[in-house]
Amino acid sequence: MNDRELSGEYSWDNLKERAKELNCLYQVDEVLNNPRLSLPDIFRELTRVMPSGWQFPEVCKVRIVYGNQSYQTPGFRSSPYSCLAPIKQDGKPVGQVEVVYVTEVVKSEEGYFLDKEMKLIRTIADRISQTILHRYMEPVLREWSQPKAQVYEGR
């Protein structure tokens, strides 16, 4: 352990970052689980809530690409300070989530993005993938279960 790891400052900073990431994930789950939102509305809302989970939210921007559409935080622009995670369906990429810092930020030992932030973006992309699948399967399951219900009622 180095001196900073032993100090309360490191522990407190580390805890604050984990709390931000966890709160971000809670907000993401609330958005993804809102049945009133369409997929485009979900993507727009996610670009609004996601920056709060990163180390430098004031310069953090998000873009979600799905199919031919792109949804992004106002002020988003390509940056050398970015991380990406694919949105997949059937194991194939159908889009991506991109988080960027639009200005240079302090580079830690882990890089411009913390390891936990890299895990966070992958988790969010995975949850988006699950939500898309769920949204497409809902009508199929409803249709599939309806005839069965009628058959059982007829007995």
Where does each model-flagged region fall?
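Short, flexible helix-adjacent loops and helix caps
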Residues: N33, L37, F76, V102-V105, ...
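Sensory-domain boundary capping and coupling elements
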Residues: K88-V105, T131
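A short beta-strand signature within small-molecule sensing/ligand-binding domains used
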Residues: S78-I87, P93
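Signal-transducing coupling segments at domain and membrane junctions
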Residues: G67-Y81, T103-K116
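Amphipathic alpha-helical "output/dimerization" segments
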Residues: M1-D3, S7, S108-T131
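Interdomain signal-transducing alpha-helices
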Residues: A19-L22, L46, M50, G91, ...
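Signal-transmission linkers at sensory-effector interfaces
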Residues: N2-V31, V97, R127, H134-R155
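Helix-loop-beta substructure at the N-terminus of cytosolic sensory domains
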Residues: L25-T73, G154-R155
